[in-house]
Structures are given as structure tokens and as C-alpha cells.
Curated annotation (Swiss-Prot):
Mn(2+) 2 binds at D9, S60, D449, H450. The lineage of its organism: Archaea, Methanobacteriati, Methanobacteriota, Stenosarchaea group, Halobacteria. This is 2,3-bisphosphoglycerate-independent phosphoglycerate mutase. It comes from Haloarcula marismortui (strain ATCC 43049 / DSM 3752 / JCM 8966 / VKM B-1809) (Halobacterium marismortui). InterPro entries: Alkaline_phosphatase_core_sf, BPG-indep_PGM_N, Metalloenzyme, PGAM_B_sf, Pgm_bpd_ind. It catalyses: (2R)-2-phosphoglycerate = (2R)-3-phosphoglycerate.
Amino acid sequence: MDAGLIILDGWGLNPDDDVRDAVAAADTPNFDRYRDAGAASTLTTHGRRVGLPEGQMGNSEVGHLNIGAGRVVKQDSARVSDSIARSRGEAPPDDDAQDPPFFENETILSAFEHAEAHGGRVHFMGLVSDGGVHSYQDHLHALIELAGERGTDAVSHAFTDGRDTSPTGGEDYLADLEAHVEEHGTGHVATVCGRYYAMDRDQNWERTRRAYDAIVHREGDHHADEAVTAATESYARDTTDEFIEPTTVGDHAGLEAGDAVVFFNFRSDRARQLTRMLGDIRPEDWGSDTEPPDTRLVTMTQYDETFDLPVAFPPNQPADVLGEVLSEAGKTQIRLAETEKYPHVTYFLNGGREVAFDGESREIVDSPDVATYDLQPEMSAPELADTAIEFIETEDPSAMVLNFANPDMVGHTGDFDAAVTAVEAVDEQLGRLVETIGAAGGHALICADHGNADDMGTEDDPHTAHTTNPVPFIYLSPDGTAGGRTARDGGTLADLAPTMLTLMGIDRPDAMTGTPLVE
């Protein structure tokens, strides 16, 4: 084995000693030992340095895309925001204008034209928050603004966050949304639903169906007169934003033939299941013969290359990504993760490509079947490490990329004690894995794609979102030391692929503008 990259998802390094930091509170003898023995530094994982708007926290999709590309990749969120800014005459100075102004986007306009021609409504659907991981509320506001200018009858289906934002921030986001509706005279909220239902990505189709039934058939668990009331009444039932049960609002008429839908999430993984339902691209176990109404469904970005749907911002796939370079060099590689992070070490790491490269193997370990991961904070880390170790010892791959999901997924629950347990569980498996890589003659690279468990907030106000704190980078030679190398400061995720290729003796392509982290 030549090299293995281990991604500790959500493992940030918080410089503030006055916060509840599950990473710092955890007993992590292996991580601490590797940091002391190896070549260590920190990486920046947010803002323009990973292709996001300035100050925006990073996330797993962005992180893995940058890692695999070996360069800063302008993210879809920034592409959409910059196009909106151009429509408003507010384009940022570094805007590359690769997309048309938002109000002139032909795919988005086609949804409006379809509804107008058929006497229908345009339905705007997506996560309503400023979390910036899956959506921006300003993108919805721009759609409402466009509908107002055209005089188009529009409604909004608001998915509440509480995961990348405060658990009860939805009340304010919905109030802001209703203010925009009032200002532009259209886009009233028809349903409110927590992302737990509307944005499941773990094949829990019964959750997706509950969101679908509220949007399409007006069959919600609850009814509210106004959007904000849907949130406040949910809080009174001790149910926070992420878990708000599908609620119909006002005189919602459902989704009807002749209507159009714009799904405005820019991140794909948690938008796929509901898109499958609405686009009639269904799994065999859907459990219903009922077909969705005949509508025009537009997605903000490409959610799946197999979906035959119009896309407002088509993918701008980077070429010469890590997996491709390894494949062309005749190297074998293995990608490993449990269910929650499997798309990230495959699709996103490969620059938005579903199909594996020649010589690329993939192993997925099922995530635990629990409602929330604080109930099983070790998740499937032991089984994942077992799978990786067996593969290394029996197949001897040239390269490995593995993701431990625990600090991120448990950090999102806001449960401090569970997050500490999650970090400790990962540290235990990290030790086993690094020893195996070294025994196989490989270099080990340890990093994170963003922070999360490094700031858990307070007991009364838990922090469930990602952080903008630096994340670790550690290099270990096969003998478990720095091997005479030092790690430079000021690195980003785009520098990881060039580092790995250099250690493997492979020339990096010109498109990889990142630079090696060790020398």
C-alpha cells in the first residue's frame, strides 16, 4: 500500500476554551500520539478557500469535492448567489460570470412559463434557513421576487433546518419568508416540514412519503393557519425544527396537473429521495401505485445524473480528479464509508461522477438503524475499520480514502456526552487503521473536512451546525513518525490530493493547483 487518507468528519480544533468542545473533552490517545509523532498542521475548510461565499461554513459535500479535485472548486451555492447578485446589479468583484443572471435563467423561467400556460401555480420547495449547507433562504426569496415581477401564482413548501442552524431558528426564518411573501404578493407558505422527513437520504422512504403526501395530497400530520404558527405549535409539542412533522398551512390546494415545481436546494444528496417521488423515479419498495400529478419539475442543480429532469445550474465537473489520476497511473484504490457518508467518498470525491474509475473499489457499511445517532454514537465505526483492515490485508490497494462519520453525525444531534463518545469511538478505530496502513508500508494522512463536534453550544442552547474552526492535518510515514518531513501552515482541503500523489510518486496534473502539505 502506498497511502491512505482518513477523514474524521466533523472533527474541528476549537481555539476557544470556554465552549463545550466534545473533541477537546474526549480521551483521544491515538490522535494525540499521532499529532505529536507526525508532521502536523491545520487546514481551512470554509469560505472562498473552498469555493463558498466568504464566511460560509464548510460541509461534507464541499469538503470532499475540494479534496478530490485538488483545487478550489467554485461551489453551486456561490454560483447561484452570484447569478442572483448579477440580476440585482450587485455582482461580487471576483464573480466569473459563468452562469446567466438568475432572472434570465431559461430553465427556471421554463417552470414559470409552464405554470402560466396551464393556469397552474409554481411551487418552490426546499430548506428554508441561512445554514448554507443545502440551501440559502435568499435563493427562495429571489424566486418569490421573480414570481412577483411576473405576476405568477406561487406557493412555498418550507423545510425547516435545526441541524445546520439553531434547533428553534425556524420560527424566525419562516417569519422572514412570510415578510417576503407579503412584499411581493405571491409565494405564500403551503406546507412546513422538518428536514428529517423531507430530506432523508438513508432510504427511509416512509419519512419521504409523509413529506410527499403533505405537499401533493394535502395530507399532513398537523394543520396551521400560518407558517410561523406551524413552528411555534411544534415547539409546544417539544419538537424542534429538524423534526417538525409535515404540516399543511392555510388553504393549501395540493400539487395539481399543470403546476410546476422548483426544488431550490443546491446540494444533491438530501434532495434525491423526494425528487424521485415527485418525478416518478421511484424505488420498487415505494409501496403505492399512485402517480404524482403531471407537472414540470426543475431542480436547482443536478441531483443525480440518471434523473431526466431540467437543471437550472448544470454541473461544472472538474477534470483530472484524484481518482482519475490514480486510475490512469495504473493504481488501485478503495473508498470506504458507512451509509451516511458513502456519497461523499464516491460521488463527491470523484467530482460529481457516479461511476467508479478503473481500479476503484467501493465498500459501504450500513449506518445503524436508529432515529438519531446520539442513541448509538459509535455508529458503525468498528465495522468500517474491520472492513478497511481486511481489504488492506487481503487486496493491498495502492491508495485508500475512508470517512469516519461519527463526530459530524452525532454532533448534529446537539448531545454533548454522545458527541464525546463518538469522538472516542473514532479515535479507537483510527489507531487500528493507522497501524494497519503502516504495516502495509503506506503513508497515512489524517484530516477533517469541516468542524462540528468542536462546538456543542450549551445545554439550554445546543449548537448542532458545522463550525468554521480549523481542522487537523497529520502526516505519518510507514514507521509512525514524521519521517523527516514537516507540514506547512496555511493549507486547505485542495492541498490533500497533491500531497497524496506526491507521496505516491505520481505527477499531479496542471489542473490540480493545490500544493503538497508536507516537505
